[in-house]
């Protein structure tokens, strides 16, 4: 039993030891946990303080950056404001200068107007003075000489004419020089700009065409038995077929380029086909005619596209195409019309006028030449009638009538079209005249110049585009020759027709000769 007691005591001791160990371990665990909690709490407080510190620094940094950015924005806004103020200031200065220039121009215009008004008053005063003197002289003549009123009047007029002719000539030169210089410079600038901006190629038109043949045997086949082929050809086409000794070539002659072109193509088709007889000639003629009709339509459309004019009636476009086969003084009329339209458009643009209207009038100004050989009347009258029929405006019709002076221009564009027509026609090499008309025109030029008083001789030069007039130096002066040049030019304009511009040059030469012995 004793050993049982020892066992019980042992178990009790073990249990007590275990309980004591557990108690001690729990206490230590609680202490360790408390330490960990305390350490964690301290760490948390440290992290919170660190985060608060970092947040405070970030906040300060953000505030500083925001202030710097706001300052930079304010500086940029201030720079932009100063820049705009400077631009406004410069603009105001430019406007002020422009106002000053306009004011000076107004003053200059006022001065010129005052000068003209004073000059007018002075002239009226002189005229009145002349009239009073004339009356006084007339009265004295009647009293002293016992002549009639009409005789006295004639004597007075003759004396006044001789006395004041020189003064009138000098006054004419002054007025002409003063008021034409600026206009002349401006006009030359505009015309020069227009011409240099439009410089087309040009090929002179002739009245004959040549067709190459494969061999000379073809000439006999074209003539046919007893000349029946050539007679049929000339009857159908209305063109002369000239067959001479020129090897492998025949010549077509006609003043009508349209008929000549149809005839040329007919010959080419006959030569290519090889079968030449009257029936075949008629067949090939119809084919060539149809080809040319298509080409006429295409030429009209190309001209309209080139110039940039729209809304034309199809029949007007067809008439334009026919101008491709029409010449005037050797100049192709369609090429001339396109050139006039382009020059008129450039001039209108320079002067701030209606460019489209000027181009339209320029393109259509010679439209009547398409059928003037088929209808009675001048090409301007025919053209105006055709345009009216196909719905063109009165302004365009006036351009057609005014470009040769049959009507007064009712719009500035009409005057521009007339000027463009003259520029195109006056271009060197653009036009030709036949020899007979050319010689007659030169003779008439010299005859007009020689008809004036104090003219010694006159010579037409530069292919009739200039006439030089030699005057007596001892009976004229520099003032009177200006008036003489103006009078001759005016008479030439009224009495002669000529392409382009004609220059009148009056020459006064004084020579003194002495001999040394």
Curated annotation (Swiss-Prot):
Entry EC number(s): 3.1.-.-
SMART domains in alphabetical order: HDc (SM00471), KH (SM00322)
Cellular component aspect of the GO annotation: plasma membrane
Domain KH: 207-267
Positions of the HD domain: 333-426
Keyword Membrane: yes
Any one GO molecular-function label of the UniProt entry: RNA binding
Entry similarity comment: Belongs to the RNase Y family.
Role played: Endoribonuclease that initiates mRNA decay.
PANTHER family named among the record's database cross-references: RIBONUCLEASE Y
Entry-linked NCBIfam families: HDIG (TIGR00277), RNase_Y (TIGR03319)
Protein name (Swiss-Prot/TrEMBL): Ribonuclease Y
Lineage: Bacteria, Thermotogati, Thermotogota, Thermotogae, Thermotogales
Gene name of this polypeptide: rny
